Amino acid sequence: ITKEPELCARVTELPVKEYGVDAAILYKDIMSPMVAMNVNVELKAGVGPVFSTPIRSMADIDKLEAFDPTKVDYIAKTITLLTSGMLDVPLIGFCGAPFTIASYLIEGGPTKNYNKTRGMLIGAPDVWDALMTKLADMSIAYLSMQAEAGANALQIFDSWVGAVNADQYKQGIYPHMERIIKTVKAKYPHLPMAMNGVGTDHLVSIWSHLPLDVIALDWRSSIVMANERGVTQT
C-alpha cells in the first residue's frame, strides 16, 4: 500500500472521515526512506522491518548511498494528492529519527534491549558518528521532500531513543538532531515541527533546547512534569 499513492492517500484519509480528527498523519513506515539509500528492507508480518545485512562497521556505512528522492517519489505523490483538495485538515509528514533508524539497521530488526546499538554508540563512537551523519543527511532530505510536496507540519519519531541515558544522548545524538531541526526550520520556517519518543521522560528537558514547536509526551509523562523541567513546547 505504501508504494501506491492513491491507496496510501485513502488510508491516510480514513481516520479523518471515521473519527473527525483535526489533522492527518501520512501513512508510511518509518523505514520507507531507506529504499532511497539502497537498503533492502523486509517488512516481516508480526515482526516488523528486518535487514538481512545489519550495519556493524565503517565499511557497511560506506555502502549506504545518499538519499535519492526519485526512488521514493510515490511518497511525494501521496502528499500532493492529499494536500491538493483531498483533505480538509492539515497533513503531518514525518520521518524516523537517526537513532531509531540506526537501531533497526544495527540490530537487524526490532529488539528489546538495544545492546548492539548502544555498543556502537559507546564502544565505536567514530563508526556511530558516521552512521548518524548519513542518517541525519537523509532526514533533512526526506523532510524537505515532504515539505516541498505540500506537508503542513513535520514530525520526527524517535521511538526507541529512551534506551539511552541523558549523557549518551547529549554526546552522540543531540548534535545530529540539532542539525536536522535547524536546517529544516531554516528552509521551511512556516512549518511547525514536532518530536516524540517512548519512555523519554529523562530526555525532554534536553529536547526543550532544540528549535521545536511541539514536544509530544507518551503516557508515562505529564504536561505538568514537563513544564516543571522547563519544557514549554508541549
Question: What feature does the model see in each segment?
Answer:
Residues I1, P5, K44, F51, ...:
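N-terminal/domain-start segments enriched in small and hydrophobic, helix-friendly residues
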Residues I1-A45, S84, Y174, E178-R179:
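N-terminal basic, low-complexity leaders that serve as flexible interaction/assembly modules and, when applicable
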Residues I1-A9, I61-F67, I101, G109-P110, ...:
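An N-terminal domain-start capping segment
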Residues T2-K3, K17, D62, I122, ...:
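Alpha-helix boundary recognition
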Residues I30-P33, G48-P49, M58, P98-T100:
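A short acidic, glycine/proline-enriched capping/turn motif at secondary-structure boundaries
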Residues V39-T53, Y104-T117:
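Short, flexible, mixed-charge acidic loops at enzyme active sites
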Residues G46-S84:
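A gly/proline- and charged-residue-enriched helix-loop-helix capping module
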Residues K71-T234:
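Active-site loop segments of alpha/beta catalytic cores
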